[in-house]
């Protein structure tokens, strides 16, 4: 973090990750002292500098939410982002069975908040849009991504929506009252059925009225009616698998 020391603006409070040519740390701005915490990603490998500096410059022009700018130093550069407090995403949903309506709101926050990832390049999006970077702020009803950007992270085709689909799977308990519309939507997300976060969020909003009606109907149905519905669903899936 020599660049931070040289600029005299940030103080390192905790190192989060470090390997050859890369270091990420939590920092405070000593010139303001307003309590805001930042994640600073420093790249000192010439390979990383050549590959990434232009991408971060483009991100800065896009005014990516939470991006506070670049710090350049002799032999390195750093990208500074606002840090969001919260419970790590996987930990939050592992410890809570979850209220459906609460999780529905968090899912909307997740999908709405990640529209900006469509605006940036695949390399930096692959580093930032990960379950490990996500936190849940239950008091605000929001899901945030803290931009710890390890340059060695990679991703395949349609990784944005596939990763979000995997996170949605973690959020919901698919019991007898779970709407088919949302279950099918998550499956489509995980299989790469959406080309962008924007397309995925648009589809999400479109299914909400019918999903709400379906859930209301399922909450009222008898056990026998549910068992019949489940049997019909199993037969339909079997036929699809066999191409009937």
Show which residues each predicted segment covers:
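ATP-binding glycine-rich loop module of kinase domains
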Residues: 1-66, 93
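Short acidic, S/G/P-rich loop/turn micro-motifs used as interaction or catalytic elements
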Residues: 43-47, 86-87, 150-153, 173-174
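Activation segment of protein kinase catalytic domains, centered on the conserved DFG
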Residues: 93-109
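Short C-lobe core helix of eukaryotic-like protein kinase catalytic domains
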Residues: 108-122
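C-lobe/activation-segment region of protein kinase-like
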Residues: 121-239
């Amino acid at each position: 973090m020599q660049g931070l020391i040289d600029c005299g603006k940030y103080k390192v409070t905790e190192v989060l990750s470090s390997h050859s040519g890369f270091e990420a740390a939590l920092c405070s701005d000593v010139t303001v002292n307003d309590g805001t915490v930042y994640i600073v990603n420093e790249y000192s490998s010439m390979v990383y500098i050549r590959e990434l500096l232009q991408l971060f410059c483009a991100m800065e022009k896009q005014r990516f939410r939470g991006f506070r700018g670049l710090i350049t130093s002799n032999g390195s550069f750093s990208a500074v982002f606002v840090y969001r407090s919260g419970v790590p995403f996987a930990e939050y949903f592992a410890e809570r069975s979850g209220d459906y309506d609460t999780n529905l709101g968090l899912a909307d926050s997740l999908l709405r908040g990640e529209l900006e990832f469509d605006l940036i390049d695949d390399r930096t999006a692959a580093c930032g849009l990960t379950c490990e970077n996500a936190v849940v702020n239950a008091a605000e009803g929001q899901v945030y991504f803290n931009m710890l950007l390890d340059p060695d992270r990679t991703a395949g085709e349609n990784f944005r929506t596939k990763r979000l689909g995997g996170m949605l799977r973690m959020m919901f308990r698919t019991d007898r009252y779970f709407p088919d519309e949302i279950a099918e939507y998550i499956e489509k997300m995980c299989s790469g059925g959406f080309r962008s976060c924007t397309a995925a969020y648009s589809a999400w909003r479109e299914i909400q009225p019918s999903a709400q009606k379906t859930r209301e109907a399922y909450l009222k149905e008898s056990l026998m009616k549910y068992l019949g519905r489940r049997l019909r669903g199993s037969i339909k899936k079997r036929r699809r698998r066999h191409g009937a």
